[in-house]
């Protein structure tokens, strides 16, 4: 079953390649959506994919896909009305 979530990721997640390594993980797993830096120093991810694959992706995000980053907290919000994406993009 397809699922969509918003992940708000807090910690050392800007200026360490977090968005680009998140994209690599998403591309490898076939997850679509976006990742962007936020003014408060966090990163926002909108991710869509099959339930089991999305859980793998969320686990990789929580573990920090970049060795120079650090994830302190992830706030996960289920999304209902999301436009379908055909790829995973780094924005902002």
Swiss-Prot record:
<dbReference type="InterPro" id="IPR036046">
    <property type="entry name" value="Acylphosphatase-like_dom_sf"/>
</dbReference>
<feature type="domain" description="Acylphosphatase-like">
    <location>
        <begin position="4"/>
        <end position="92"/>
    </location>
</feature>
<comment type="similarity">
    <text>Belongs to the acylphosphatase family.</text>
</comment>
<dbReference type="InterPro" id="IPR020456">
    <property type="entry name" value="Acylphosphatase"/>
</dbReference>
<dbReference type="InterPro" id="IPR001792">
    <property type="entry name" value="Acylphosphatase-like_dom"/>
</dbReference>
<feature type="active site">
    <location>
        <position position="19"/>
    </location>
</feature>
<keyword id="KW-0378">Hydrolase</keyword>
<dbReference type="Pfam" id="PF00708">
    <property type="entry name" value="Acylphosphatase"/>
</dbReference>
<dbReference type="InterPro" id="IPR017968">
    <property type="entry name" value="Acylphosphatase_CS"/>
</dbReference>
<dbReference type="GO" id="GO:0003998">
    <property type="term" value="F:acylphosphatase activity"/>
</dbReference>
<protein>
    <recommendedName>
        <fullName>Acylphosphatase</fullName>
        <ecNumber>3.6.1.7</ecNumber>
    </recommendedName>
</protein>
<feature type="active site">
    <location>
        <position position="37"/>
    </location>
</feature>
């Amino acid at each position: 079953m397809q699922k969509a979530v918003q992940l708000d990721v807090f910690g050392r997640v800007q200026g360490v390649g977090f968005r680009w390594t998140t994209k690599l993980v998403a591309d490898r797993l076939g997850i679509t959506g976006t990742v962007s830096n936020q003014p408060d120093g966090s990163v926002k991810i909108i991710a869509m994919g099959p339930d089991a694959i999305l859980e793998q992706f969320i686990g990789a995000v929580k573990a920090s896909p970049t060795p120079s980053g650090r994830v302190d907290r992830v706030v996960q919000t289920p999304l209902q009305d999301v436009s379908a994406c055909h790829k995973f993009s780094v924005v902002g």
